């Protein structure tokens, strides 16, 4: 299990996550060993996904730029063709934030089959920090997914838009450091 900031701390001291992010998820000096190991998109691409490089489009490193922008906390819009690597542009930064600040990235998708495919594809790569919570889950699978979000094991949460109305989802999101909505 990962150590996450307790919900009561987030509620009573909301700036604590800002301080943690500044210390653990903001690049500092060139040559910093921590930043080179934890905040470098190329190293993380290799260590987390096993890829040597990002895809390019007509010689432009669009996938890398999108991933780097997300790591830096910037808002972005990435438009790639089907199968062009859009998912990596949010999955890589999400996993990096999960490791550095125990952050949670919430991915909102209306397609339950797509959410399941995303989680299954990550699991096939040995990445177990992604879960989905939707109305099609049996109670045991749902409870296990909620537990992974609550205890900080999950860095990526895939939910459908209607799940945002759920009191359970609201409660678990308020108790976590949500770093990005996709």
What are these regions (language model features)?
Residues 1-35:
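N-terminal accessory nucleic-acid engagement/regulatory domains that precede
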Residues 8-14, 173, 180-182:
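Structured, non-catalytic alpha/beta "coupling" segments that mediate domain-domain communication
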Residues 31-81:
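Conserved pre-motif I regulatory segment
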Residues 46-49, 127, 149-152:
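Conserved NTP-binding/hydrolysis module of P-loop NTPases
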Residues 53-57, 82-84, 132-137, 159:
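Short, flexible loop segments at the rims of nucleotide/cofactor-binding pockets, characterized by
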Residues 56-61, 88, 136-140, 164:
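Conserved phosphate-coordination/catalytic loops
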Residues 72, 95, 120, 137-181:
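Conserved helix/coil segment N-terminal to the catalytic DExD/H
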Residues 79-84, 89-130, 134, 152-155:
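Conserved SF1/SF2 helicase motif Ia
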């Amino acid at each position: 299990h990962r150590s996450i900031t307790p919900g009561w701390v987030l509620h009573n001291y909301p700036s604590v996550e800002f301080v943690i992010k500044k210390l653990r998820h903001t690049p500092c000096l060139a040559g910093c060993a921590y930043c080179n190991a934890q905040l470098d998109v190329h190293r993380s691409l290799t260590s987390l996904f096993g890829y040597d490089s990002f895809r390019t489009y007509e010689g432009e490193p669009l996938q890398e730029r999108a991933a780097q922008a997300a790591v830096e906390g910037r808002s972005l819009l990435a438009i790639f063709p089907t199968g062009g690597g859009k998912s990596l542009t949010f999955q890589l930064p999400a996993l990096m934030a999960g490791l550095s600040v125990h952050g949670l990235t919430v991915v909102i998708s209306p397609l339950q089959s797509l959410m399941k495919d995303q989680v299954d594809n990550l699991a096939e790569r040995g990445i177990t920090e992604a879960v989905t919570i939707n109305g099609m889950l049996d109670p045991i699978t749902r409870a296990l997914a909620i537990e992974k979000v609550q205890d900080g094991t999950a860095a990526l949460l895939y939910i459908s838009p209607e799940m945002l109305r759920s009191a359970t989802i609201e409660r678990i999101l308020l108790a976590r450091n949500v770093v990005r909505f996709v």
